[in-house]
């Protein structure tokens, strides 16, 4: 990964000591402030349970190193840790990642986290067995996923698609076009793909594998 100047914070959470690596300089401090404010509550903003698509398909994923992009409060990454994966979570919000560690402690697992500005981040090639990214849209980063996977590694991506605009005030730039995930990850072998629309939400999900 890109070498950012970092320093370490040691925090104690009800008996658990963990290391959270924090970048010294963030290019988008306004984003950090906005998400830190959102996560500054005891309640988990998006709940503690993982997304169903991940639970339903976890048996397909190769065991090993997971990179959880935009981890937030950790519901998906922590779930994978309970399933025996080694999890590194990245997010711009230190407060969100602190809650992720609390959730990991609650589930008797450990995770590693790093505070980064994903809009100025480069993934290390051939490093991860699984790359997980849910409800975070950054297409230039998506394009790095294939090279960052080990041969045989898989991506798991789920986020809102254009039909979601029917149900919520939501910026068009954060919504996928129809079948866009299939186009973005056309170099990978599609294992699972779905478009979901229940009349309240609409999103697309994909699991795809890098060739051996």
Question: Language-model features: where?
Answer:
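A short, conserved alpha-helix within the catalytic core of class I
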Residues: 137-149
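Conserved SAM-binding motif I beta-strand of class I
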Residues: 86-91
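A short acidic, Gly/Pro-enriched loop at the edge of an enzyme's catalytic core
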Residues: 121-130
């Amino acid at each position: 990964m890109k070498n950012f100047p970092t320093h370490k914070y040691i925090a104690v959470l009800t008996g658990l000591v963990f290391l959270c690596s924090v970048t010294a300089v963030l290019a988008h401090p306004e984003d950090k402030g906005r998400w830190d404010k959102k996560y500054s509550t005891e309640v988990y903003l998006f709940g503690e349970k993982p997304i169903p698509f991940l639970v339903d398909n976890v048996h397909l994923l190769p065991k090993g190193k997971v990179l959880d992009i935009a981890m937030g409060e950790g519901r998906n990454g922590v779930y994978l840790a309970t399933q025996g994966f080694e999890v590194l979570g990245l997010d711009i919000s230190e407060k969100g990642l602190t809650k992720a560690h609390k959730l990991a402690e609650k589930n008797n697992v450990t995770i590693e986290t790093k505070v980064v500005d994903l809009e100025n981040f480069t993934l290390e090639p051939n490093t991860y067995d699984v790359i997980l990214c849910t409800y975070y849209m950054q297409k230039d980063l998506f394009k790095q996923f294939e090279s960052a996977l080990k041969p045989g590694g898989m991506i798991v991506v789920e986020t809102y698609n254009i039909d979601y605009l029917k149900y919520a005030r939501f910026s068009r730039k954060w919504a996928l076009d129809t079948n866009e995930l299939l186009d973005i990850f056309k170099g990978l072998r599609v294992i699972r793909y779905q478009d979901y629309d229940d009349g309240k939400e609409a999103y697309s999900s994909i699991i795809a594998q890098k060739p051996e």
